[in-house]
């Protein structure tokens, strides 16, 4: 069964691919209004049925009757029954070739949101793989009065499963039961490539962000240095706020600053998706304050340690809240350093320790990561990889990100084969 089924808890109606689900939901929302009920209707539609007229008739109806007790999700993964939507009937713009890399994350090329706005809808566009963005979008939609709301969630179909990811051939198909355990292992070992833009042209960081977009980076790593905690100085929250409209790629803000508790709110307001502070400038009390601020604002929580620092004992009180732990493999604040080899053993030890304490986030390897050592970093337990001059400093950023990803995939295949034999 390729479509949501009534056997799935919470699903009350299955519209299939004919686009009638939105009309059904509007009927429910109007009935709730007539009956004086305050419940809310949630509807998920795909981009395939958004090529059809039924959806747009319903869109006009929802705007006419100001249906604000309904939230619609558009799963914008660019794939429909026959191929990519942008090749069959473009919702954004026509796709030439098969490479969606740039269009997927380049906000300047998106037209779908404008179409819904022209029909009188409140439109919220998000990265559909960030639970924090989903939660925040639902809250904003629920607060909107007098307009129907749609959350356009940019997603990658089959994300994390190598043979399914961004593959139209897997539309409406379920995997065979015998390969499900492998798929589960793949999902448990998803990874992210995070280029650090300070390795590029500091006078034109907009260009560096666009290179990351074109290369289909998973995160954009933002190294904030204040000249006090580390000797160098880069940029602050004002620059992050300027860059934020360029893309929905999550901003991974690494604050190498003194007294971060005094400044974190500025980086939240600037649009950071994940904010990491250093254990060296926190104690249990200040980190608790930071956690509260980040958690209440739907921002990922990160803690970083320098090469000569171990995780402090107080951090284990927050371990179930942590989204990421950065283990520095170079001395922060200096560029062009080589990876400190002892970091491999340190990462393996910390990964084991965190797992025993029920850590459900991921470890990020930061500093000197390159094509030669990224596979070993993955095998150590890291799942996010910051690349500075090894990515941004290269002539073809798109190709080098692809090569980074291929190296990790090769290591992951080896681990999966070993586990299967064990």
Can you annotate each of these PLM segments?
Residues 36-39, 86-137:
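Conserved thiamine diphosphate
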Residues 220-237, 277-281, 330-338, 389, ...:
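Glycine-rich, proline-tolerant flexible connector loops at the mouths of alpha/beta enzymes
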Residues 191-196, 220-222, 251-255, 273-277, ...:
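Hydrophobic faces of well-ordered beta-strands that scaffold small-molecule active sites
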Residues 294, 378, 392-421:
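C-terminal helical cap(s) of enzyme catalytic domains, especially alpha/beta-barrels
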Residues 204, 262-263, 272-360, 415:
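Conserved anion-binding
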Residues 209, 259-269, 308-322, 367-385:
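Catalytic cores of alpha/beta
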Residues 1-65:
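Cofactor-binding active-site loop characterized by glycine-rich and histidine/acidic residues
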Residues 131-190:
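Glycine/aspartate-rich loop-and-adjacent alpha/beta segment that forms the canonical ThDP
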